Amino acid sequence: MRGTVYKSTGSWYAVLGQDGQMHECRIKGKFRVQGIKSTNPVAVGDLVQFELEQSGDNPHGVIFDIVERRNYMIRKSVNLSKQTQIIAANIDQALLLITLNNPPTLTPFIDRFLVTAEAYDIPVILVFNKIDCYSAEERFEVDYLLSLYRTIGYTCLLVSALTGTGVDDLKQMMEGKTSLVSGHSGVGKSTLINT
């Protein structure tokens, strides 16, 4: 059966099968994707082939093939090895959530993200979140960053999950697209997704 990986925990994967059901799956034996030294060969967004197996009372799937990826986005493994981590595959766009404080997102982080996305031909939307929390000085800094990144061709959006500012525009930009939502812990990814 064919399906799409929706969640990866490292050894188990939630796969939405073509039957419309979510299946818990694992990979079969030593699984390698040609040309990529990765900490985990299966990524969220991958189209996979899997077989259902019965093991006691818990049926599960076994992934035996990954359909060729349209694209993917990686990051270096945090343990300083030469391996990479595929963070998403087959995506239409990436959204980078940015906050000036709680937590701060620094421009080198933004720039590294943009370079990585450009390397894999993935369009990026910069989403400046928590705009309801900024002082006049911080708002000036946001305006500077907006001007900077818009000038070099990036779509930028101001949002606040708390007040709803910009949320409808964000939903419209995501409509019908497979989007990677990224950013530091605490920038509001889950809050915005659940809004």
Label every PLM stretch briefly.
Residues 1-107:
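N-terminal accessory targeting/assembly segments
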